[in-house]
Amino acid sequence: MKKDIISGQTGVAASAAVVAFCDVDDSLITTTRVSPCEGAEPCAVDDKGLVCGYLSPKQRVLNQLLAASAQVVLTTARSSKGLKNVQLPVSSGAYAIVSFGGVILTPAGCPEPRWHQRMSEESGQYAALLDELCAHIKDVAAEKNIDVRVRVVVDAGLPLYVSVKHNQKNLFELCTIKAAAESFLQEHHPAAARQQMFTHFNGNFLAFLPPFLRKEYAVRWFMENVAAPGALSIGLGDSESDLAFMSLCDYVLMPSRSQAFAGLRR
């Protein structure tokens, strides 16, 4: 029987020895409504069916390389529903960590029951706070005439975090919303603020995460409970917030034009 070069074990596929935790937007794909370069192919749509993501030729090579050599675990802020709107070479029949780690999807597309039970217990403690924060942001946006979409993201029946996106991609006004929301938390929910309510802000995406919700928590649990023992791990991401889960891995990979890489160079 042929001995696998990467795993070093007879009859063991290379993908069993390597697990790659990969962010999706602006890592495996380019999030844009306009083709980013010649040869790019549409690979993602929004809820209205309009193209919102492309796969560049180099990203296609990266996707194919990962699919051929690793167990790929998509690790994304996208919800379960949002991930279904993305078509990638690595996404078929794979595990996925979605909604900032709030849900781990099995290859069958169902929530991993052990992790889901844990998140169900945690999320129930913060449901009212998320609703209150969402309502406050809507009030601030209306008062200041800021055109944003605000919602509590619910995935697999669990209220997980508050998402804010500007309809004209006005980052200055998003910063205004960010400051108002953080001030509200400090004043009205100081305990939650001290427990590290986390603000994710990258491009036109602003999100407020309760203390239990982090990609790195789900990645660590996956490593301990699902991944093959001793597997080589790779972390791929583009946001500064991705560095936390990437740092759990043996090797780190990021786009050279990304928030994460720019932060490391500062």
Residues covered by each model-derived region:
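Phosphate- and divalent-cation-binding pockets in alpha/beta enzyme and binding domains
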Residues: 82-85, 218, 244-245, 263
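Active-site neighborhood of HAD-like aspartate-dependent phosphohydrolases
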Residues: 4-20, 24-72, 80-84
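Conserved acidic, metal-coordinating active-site core of Asp-based
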Residues: 136-234, 240-248
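Asp-based, Mg2+/Mn2+-dependent phosphohydrolase catalytic module
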Residues: 248-266
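Short, well-ordered beta-strand core segments
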Residues: 72, 96, 233, 252-253
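Active-site phosphate-binding/coordination module
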Residues: 54-142
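The start of beta-strands in P-loop NTPase/AAA+ ATPase cores
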Residues: 18-20, 94, 233
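Short loop/turn segments at strand-loop or loop-helix junctions that form parts
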Residues: 22-34, 99-101, 107-109, 155-157, ...
